[in-house]
């Protein structure tokens, strides 16, 4: 994984970002970006996300993370999915907004989505 990623100005005028119900979901989405692998994927377990992305923000509980993920999936910013009973997520427009140099990136860390999406009740 890269140490950092680009955050382009287009995020400010994104209709999908505007459709998110909370600023918490917007913040979490942007803070995810440097943690994504070369394909725009990361763990989808709310507890892991809490511990990795927002470990020091007490207001961000695992339940709040789960609500934010459901909202991101609802507007089409992420695909939240299962592989072998483990949750992962895929940012849907990652390649459009990142200039990836695959020769310098580490190998894929997270499995590709199959046909199973996660719902907030899962």
Language model: regions and residue ranges:
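Winged-helix/helix-turn-helix nucleic-acid-interaction surface
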Residues: 1-20, 58-122
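Short alpha-helical segments that sit at the start of domains
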Residues: 4-43
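Generic preference for well-ordered alpha-helical elements
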Residues: 26, 46, 62-65
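Generic detector of isolated residues embedded in canonical secondary-structure elements
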Residues: 27-28, 48, 71, 90
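Alpha-helical recognition domains of nuclear gene-regulatory proteins
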Residues: 31, 52, 68-71
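Short, intrinsically disordered, mixed-charge
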Residues: 34, 54-55, 74
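A short glycine/small-residue-enriched secondary-structure motif
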Residues: 42-51, 89
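Short helix-coil junctions and helix-kink-helix linkers
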Residues: 48-62
